[in-house]
Each structure stands twice: as structure tokens, then as C-alpha cells.
Amino acid sequence: MPQLTKKQKAMQGKVDSTRLYAFTDALVLVKQAATAKFDESIDVAVQLGIDAKKSDQVVRGAVVLPNGTGKITRVAVFAQGAKAEEAKAAGADVVGMDDLAAMVKAGDMPFDVVIAAPDAMRVVGTLGQILGPRGLMPNPKVGTVTPDVALAVKNAKAGQVQFRANKAGIVHSTIGRRSFDDAKLQGNLAALIDALNKTKPASSKGQYLRKLALSSTMGVGVRVDTQSITV
């Protein structure tokens, strides 16, 4: 485990780990702790009231953050013919079929998101062992296997984030950058929470949004009172 810097230790002393902060107060602390020379990501961890080991309690989806992520997203699309042209017109960075598959097999993957038209899955399906571990395998549940490749490209470029609860029932996601004003970060978090609520499994019982914490890339975590978030 990496050692904390003097600034991180000082910030830890300012954060009461037993307290639930209002979102705006938590954001002040998180931004104060984001002292790196680059524009740190503001991230959220949400503990859900699910049993992630049960197949009927899998939480997975995607949402376009209304204020973007602050990151340039590079998009690759597996498509041919008219669909390939639609993807290019929408701003895809790389479009192809067998030629794109060859790039992937060679380890040449200059992209962050992979989208596929349904008829391209015969090619994409052979790349599962490469794309899967990198979190790049297209999936209809998050809208990356779709006949509307143009819309998928536009969503990815506009700041769409994919989310999935891990084995502990925790969802990790970015909601923007330190340079974002508080209103934009709050708007992005509200969109994420709304998407999580919409994907709540019917078999999930009790409180669904159990815990929430904010942090920056290099900063400390701050627990947030979920009641302080307006969706």
C-alpha cells in the first residue's frame, strides 16, 4: 500500500471518518484534497443493498452524464457498409471489421470504448479474451451492441459512463473533474443515482442506496449522506 504524502495525511486529519457529510460539504473537502498537478478525477463509490452473487441482483448499465466526464473518449466501432459510414459520420475514431480485429489481436488498441453492430458480433466474439479483461467487450446491456451505432458513438463522446456492481455490491464511477463547478458535479451524480435507481433489481429488499463516498484520484475518501443528494 503506497505511503500517504504530508498533504494527504493533513487532509485525513480534517475528515471525520464517522460522519456523513452533506454532498456540498463533502465536495469542498474532496477538492481541497485534490492537490495533484493534473486535473484529478472526482469519483464516487456507491454501496448498494443487493446480493451481487445472485443472478437476479446484477446491477449493470450506462448513463450519459449531462455535464460530461472531462475526458476525451476514443471510440472504435465494428461495423460494415452503411453502418460503418454512420459511425464515421458520428465521430468514431476507428471503424472496421476484420481489419479492426487484426489491430486488436496485435495489441494496437487506441480507444476507450468499443461498439458493435449486431451483425459484427461474429467477428467481435473471437476477441473476447482480449477485450473482456480490459472492460472493452461490447454488451447490449450497456448499449454497446446496437443497430444504432451512430447514437452509441454520440453517447460515448458526450460523456457516457458504464457502471456495474462488483462482488461486494459496490459501484465505482467518475462524475467529472476537479475543475468542474459544484453544480456540474452534482448534476452528474444525480444522473448516476437516477440510473442506479432505474436498474434496482425487483428482488432487492430494504434500503437500496446504503452508502456513498466521494474521492479524487489522489485524495482521501469522504462519506456522503445520501439524503443530501437531489435526483
UniProtKB/Swiss-Prot annotation:
Cleavable signal peptide: none
Does this entry carry the keyword RNA-binding? yes
Q: Which UniProt keywords apply?
A: Repressor, Ribonucleoprotein, Ribosomal protein, RNA-binding, rRNA-binding, Translation regulation, tRNA-binding
NCBIfam families hit by this protein: rplA_bact
Q: Choose any GO biological process term that the UniProt entry carries and state it.
A: regulation of translation
The reply to whether rRNA-binding figures as a keyword in the UniProt entry is: yes
Q: Which domain of life is it from?
A: Bacteria
Which CDD domains does this chain map to?
Ribosomal_L1
Which cellular component, as a GO term, is one annotated location?
cytosolic large ribosomal subunit
UniProt xrefs under Pfam families:
Ribosomal_L1 (PF00687)
Return the protein name: Large ribosomal subunit protein uL1
In its UniProt record, a GO molecular function of this protein is:
tRNA binding
Q: State how it assembles.
A: Part of the 50S ribosomal subunit.
